[in-house]
């Protein structure tokens, strides 16, 4: 399936130069003062693991790999693998931790994830778009900080660092985007 360069998202798997590449970083859309707009994409080769930065014109169309998606439940870690169970057929599979890279810390027991297969081989794991996590470390609340739009650093229960509004305290639960690890809102 062909997609425009502007439609490329983190986690997409592209067929580029006869290889499969996963988009590992949020693509940067750039409109220079002179010349045409382009999209800067950081990709990782699924066979070799090499990373590459590629610049595509906004007018370019790329081949997105046709993948089969299945829901799996994360059960536990086994060495360097994740053990996942198919939610329909209850089959278990082992997948390398490397597939999730820095997003591994978002994974929690019994979380439902989407595993993408290409020719019956697992290629990618998609986490839910957002997760709810507790703030374990942050600076104290500054009185009257609800009126300001400034952010302060916070460390979450899984060790990830995010910027949160000034009014949030240790122990509060927040919603965090899994694709770019940013604060969304206070959990309800």
Curated annotation (Swiss-Prot):
Its main location: cytoplasm. One of its GO terms (cellular component) is cytoplasm. The keyword Cytoplasm applies. It is found in: Cytoplasm. InterPro entries: Elong-fact-P_C (IPR015365), NA-bd_OB-fold (IPR012340), Rib_uL2_dom2 (IPR014722), Transl_elong_fac_P/YeiP (IPR020599), Transl_elong_KOW-like (IPR013185), Transl_elong_P/YeiP_cen (IPR001059), Transl_elong_P/YeiP_CS (IPR013852), Transl_elongation_fac_P (IPR011768). One of its GO terms (molecular function) is translation elongation factor activity. Gene3D superfamilies: 2.30.30.30, Nucleic acid-binding proteins. GO terms for biological process: peptide biosynthetic process. Keywords: Cytoplasm, Elongation factor, Protein biosynthesis. PROSITE patterns: EFP. Pathway: Protein biosynthesis; polypeptide chain elongation. NCBIfam families: efp, PRK00529.1. Belongs to the elongation factor P family. Involved in peptide bond synthesis. Stimulates efficient translation and peptide-bond synthesis on native or reconstituted 70S ribosomes in vitro. Probably functions indirectly by altering the affinity of the ribosome for aminoacyl-tRNA, thus increasing their reactivity as acceptors for peptidyl transferase. This is Elongation factor P. It comes from Rickettsia africae (strain ESF-5).
